[in-house]
């Protein structure tokens, strides 16, 4: 999960729009997913996917930055921000060397792990439960080529799922082989990796529900747009 890194970025004073751009992009575009994509779909589709994933993160982060959403971070993370600021200020005033900061750094890291561990377990359990109950052939029937609404349906169907990009690439390869348009399949992949109920369970530790809804709504809109653009650019 990218959540601990997201927390670290926020604690480090990095603007929230930049941290959101990281949160969106990091699960979508990574070396394993790109390698699998290259083998499954070739250079052209891989390049378009990688560029669109990066642009999705950049645009999503830029839009979310304009909303000034810091006030919607959870009380837990805001408490960590205050504590971190006080510690950093004291270290700078005293010129504390790095080796003497190590114990505090490890303590803070452990507090973050303890804070999100339960939510990680809940998210994984929810994803596993959904994987076990989805009927065979359901997704292919819902995302067939003749339906104009296939892209938003693909995104909605992906929300209960939970998987990383490397795990989902073989799945969308099967979808495409069974006639699902490539843009629709990739929208499903992006939503599975970047948007899901288990992901919301993880984010609840660091965000209020209002911020989660804003984040999910913004990213959903961009993923649906990306799916339609893919279907236009890579029409059969």
Model regions and ranges:
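Selected transmembrane alpha-helices and immediately adjacent juxtamembrane segments
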Residues: 51-151, 177, 213-236
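Membrane-interfacial helix-loop connectors
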Residues: 1-50, 131-211, 216
């Amino acid at each position: 999960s990218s959540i601990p890194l997201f927390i670290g970025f926020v604690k480090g004073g990095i603007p929230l729009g930049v941290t959101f751009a990281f949160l969106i992009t990091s699960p979508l575009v990574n070396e394993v997913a790109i390698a699998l994509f290259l083998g499954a779909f070739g250079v052209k589709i891989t390049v378009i996917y990688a560029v669109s994933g990066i642009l999705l993160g950049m645009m999503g982060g830029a839009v979310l930055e304009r909303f000034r959403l810091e006030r919607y971070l959870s009380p837990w993370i805001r408490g960590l921000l205050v504590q971190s600021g006080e510690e950093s200020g004291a270290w700078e005033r005293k010129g504390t060397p790095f080796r003497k900061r190590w114990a505090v750094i490890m303590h803070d890291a452990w507090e973050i792990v303890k804070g999100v561990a339960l939510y990680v377990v809940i998210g994984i359990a929810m994803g596993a439960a959904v994987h076990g109950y989805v009927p065979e052939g359901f997704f292919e029937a819902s995302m067939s080529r003749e339906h104009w609404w296939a892209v938003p349906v693909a995104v909605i169907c992906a929300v209960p799922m939970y998987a990383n990009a490397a795990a989902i690439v073989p799945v969308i390869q099967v979808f495409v082989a069974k006639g699902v348009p490539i843009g629709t399949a990739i929208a499903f992949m992006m939503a599975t990796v970047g948007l899901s109920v288990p992901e919301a369970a993880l984010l609840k530790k660091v965000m209020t529900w209002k911020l989660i809804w804003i984040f999910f709504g913004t990213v959903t809109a961009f993923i649906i747009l990306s799916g339609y653009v893919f279907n236009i650019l890579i029409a059969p």
